[in-house]
C-alpha cells in the first residue's frame, strides 16, 4: 500500500531504476520504492525528471504535482485511462440524472457544513450551533445558498471577524495550498475509478478541468482548515508547507478501521 508523500525541494535529478525512484543531488543519492509512494511533489523548478520515471509513476498511479517558481502547486500528471471500463463509466457519467446530481450535491453541502460545525466545536466556538441550523434549512441543490452563509460565519469564527478569504495573508496562502493538494488527491482517485474530472455534479465551469473533484472534495476542506488553524502561520514557507503535506498522513476512523487521509478519500470516491 502506498503511503509516502515525497517532496523534492532542491536541485536534483529524478530517475527510475529497478522499481525505485532515484533522487540524485550534489550531496547524495536516495532511493524510494515506487510502491511506497502515494504523492510526489516537485516543488523546485530546478529538477530534471526522466520520461522512464514518469511512465512508471503513471503506471503505479502515483500522483505527481509540479510547483511553479513560487513553490505553489501549478499542474499535475494525470493518465488518460484510469480504469479498464472507463468508456462505459464515462457514458454513464454523461447520462447522470439531473435530480440525482442535485440530491447528491445537497448531501455533499450538508456534510461540508456538518464538518465545519465540528471544527468550531473543537475550538469551543458557539457559532457551531448556528451552522447546524443551516443544515436544517437546506433545500434541494442548496437553492438558498446555505453553503455560502455557513462559510462566512465559519471563517469569521475560526480566524476572526476581520478575516476575508480574499486577503493576501499567510492564512489564505496556507488554505489555498492545502486545498490544492486535496484537490489533486481527488483528481487521482476520480481518474483511477474511470471517470472524468471535468463533468461535475454542481460545479460547471467550462474552464475548470476539475469540476467533479471540486464537488467531491468539499466535505474534506475543514481538515485543511484545522491544520491551518493549529499552525496559525505568520509566514508561509517551507516549514509550513511540510506541515500541510503531513495532513495526507493523518489518520481517521472509517467503519471502525484506521485509515490515512489518502485512503479515506479513496474509500469515499468509491462509495
Predicted features and spans:
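Short, extreme N-terminal leader segments that mark the start of a protein/domain
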Residues: 1-41, 49
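Glycine/small-residue-rich interface belts in oligomeric ring/scaffold proteins
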Residues: 32, 36-85
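Active-site helix-to-loop segments that bind/position phosphate- or nucleotide-bearing substrates
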Residues: 3-5, 11-12, 26, 59, ...
